[in-house]
Amino acid sequence: MKTKLSTCNVWSLLLVLLVWDPVRLVLANIQEDEAKNNITIFTRILDRLLDGYDNRLRPGLGDSITEVFTNIYVTSFGPVSDTDMEYTIDVFFRQKWKDERLKFKGPMNILRLNNLMASKIWTPDTFFHNGKKSVAHNMTMPNKLLRIQDDGTLLYTMRLTVQAECPMHLEDFPMDAHSCPLKFGSYAYTTSEVTYIWTYNASDSVQVAPDGSRLNQYDLLGQSIGKETIKSSTGEYTVMTAHFHLKRKIGYFVIQTYLPCIMTVILSQVSFWLNRESVPARTVFGVTTVLTMTTLSISARNSLPKVAYATAMDWFIAVCYAFVFSALIEFATVNYFTKRGWAWDGKSVVNDKKKEKGSVMIQNNAYAVAVANYAPNLSKDPVLSTISKSATTPEPNKKPENKPAEAKKTFNSVSKIDRMSRIVFPVLFGTFNLVYWATYLNREPVLGVSP
């Protein structure tokens, strides 16, 4: 029984193999024929679509307005140039419209094509109003995508890198915020022929890749969209606007400018604690800090465009410069009054000595006159001669009169101006910093509003 069963299984397997090979070949031939038929069908569809198609004419010419739906996917944003007031953005720019001439029927609902077909049909003549330079990527082939649906709806996508203008108001620099626009629209068609519409809402029509930020000095806060109509001598045109909201990072400028300025001001106030007689040391402090502030103010302006107004950093540097220069003027004032005080002290000492010498001379002159008047009678009167001798003989036990101490120059003394400056200067500078940082850091960023 076992031998008969095994023999039956072998014959069954051989029979299946003999039957399956022809069936497999037949199925493969059928699939190959279907693929060839599909290619043939698609080729015929495309040929039929382009037969009599004029890509010089827009869809719905003379009947309706062509509506172009757009959205943008940002793959890379930045860098932003402050000196040139421009930014660079890399995007997938998508446009969608309907062309009744491209309706078709076939086994597929969507035809997925490349840039070769895009050059044979009508496409919107979109350009960027504020673009300084735009590049369409062509490596290794033009980065373009075209999809045609069976109802005539087309999706046209291309990869672009755009350098666009970004108007900046730098009054609050470096605590400033900006709204960089990207404006685009039709170059030739007015609003009565072609109009643009955002495909989705504000958050979905312009999307930024999670790793798309290429900003070192800014934070990308978000984006908004808008639409406006501009008038020119050739008609009215639709302009689509996407705003990218930026907030500057202050850390770099704190390290490079603010901290050095603060330390320079503090260093200039160290001279208040030096002796007023230390002229070389205090002069070095004053001149060095003034030159340092000059260098800092020049270097801070190098990274900015040459604007005609003062920025927040300019005001800070100007006030710091005023404090440093005031410290130098304070030393000059202290030095002037110190030397003037010494001069008055010396003059008073000289006057006292002159007065004392004058009184001695007056006494000697009076005595000489008395002697001269009574000299002829001294020999006649023995009493007068005795008195005159006793008058000329000094008294040995007479104590000298107490004379006022001579004024002396006082060294290592502290000026009243220095004492006041030690308190007034730090208090004023601290108050200025408190008001300055509280004003600018708590201020809400002023961003451009989309029309």
Swiss-Prot record:
Membrane topology note: Multi-pass membrane protein
One Pfam family here: Neur_chan_LBD
Would you indicate the residue range of the signal peptide? 1-28
Identify the InterPro entries for this entry: GABAA/Glycine_rcpt (IPR006028), GABAAa_rcpt (IPR001390), GABBAa2_rcpt (IPR005432), Gabra-1-6_TM (IPR047024), Gabra-2_ECD (IPR047023), Neur_chan_lig-bd (IPR006202), Neur_chan_lig-bd_sf (IPR036734), Neur_channel (IPR006201)
Recorded GO MF terms: benzodiazepine receptor activity; GABA-A receptor activity; GABA-gated chloride ion channel activity; ligand-gated monoatomic ion channel activity involved in regulation of presynaptic membrane potential; transmitter-gated monoatomic ion channel activity involved in regulation of postsynaptic membrane potential
Q: List the GO cellular component terms.
A: axon; chloride channel complex; dendrite; GABA-A receptor complex; GABA-ergic synapse; inhibitory synapse; neuronal cell body; postsynapse
Q: How is its activity regulated?
A: Activated by pentobarbital. Inhibited by the antagonist bicuculline.
Q: Which UniProt keywords apply?
A: Cell membrane, Cell projection, Chloride, Chloride channel, Cytoplasmic vesicle, Disulfide bond, Glycoprotein, Ion channel, Ion transport, Ligand-gated ion channel, Membrane, Postsynaptic cell membrane, Receptor, Signal, Synapse, Transmembrane, Transmembrane helix, Transport
For this chain, the family text in UniProt reads: Belongs to the ligand-gated ion channel (TC 1.A.9) family. Gamma-aminobutyric acid receptor (TC 1.A.9.5) subfamily. GABRA2 sub-subfamily.
Instruction: Write out the PTM section of this UniProt entry.
Output: Glycosylated.
Q: Which gene encodes it?
A: Gabra2
Chain spans, region Disordered: 389-408
Q: Which GO terms describe its biological process?
A: gamma-aminobutyric acid signaling pathway; inhibitory synapse assembly
In which residues is 4-aminobutanoate bound?
A: 94, 157
Q: Which residues are glycosylated?
A: 38, 138
Main location, first listed in the record: membrane
> What function does this protein fulfil?
Alpha subunit of the heteropentameric ligand-gated chloride channel gated by gamma-aminobutyric acid (GABA), a major inhibitory neurotransmitter in the brain. GABA-gated chloride channels, also named GABA(A) receptors (GABAAR), consist of five subunits arranged around a central pore and contain GABA active binding site(s) located at the alpha and beta subunit interface(s). When activated by GABA, GABAARs selectively allow the flow of chloride anions across the cell membrane down their electrochemical gradient.
Originating organism: Mus musculus (Mouse)
Q: Where in the cell is it found?
A: Postsynaptic cell membrane; Cell membrane; Cytoplasmic vesicle membrane; Cell projection, Dendrite
**Disulfide bonds, paired cysteine numbers:** 166-180
The name on file for this protein is Gamma-aminobutyric acid receptor subunit alpha-2
Entry-linked PROSITE patterns: NEUROTR_ION_CHANNEL (PS00236)
Spell out which residues lie on the membrane's Extracellular side. 29-249, 301-311, 442-451
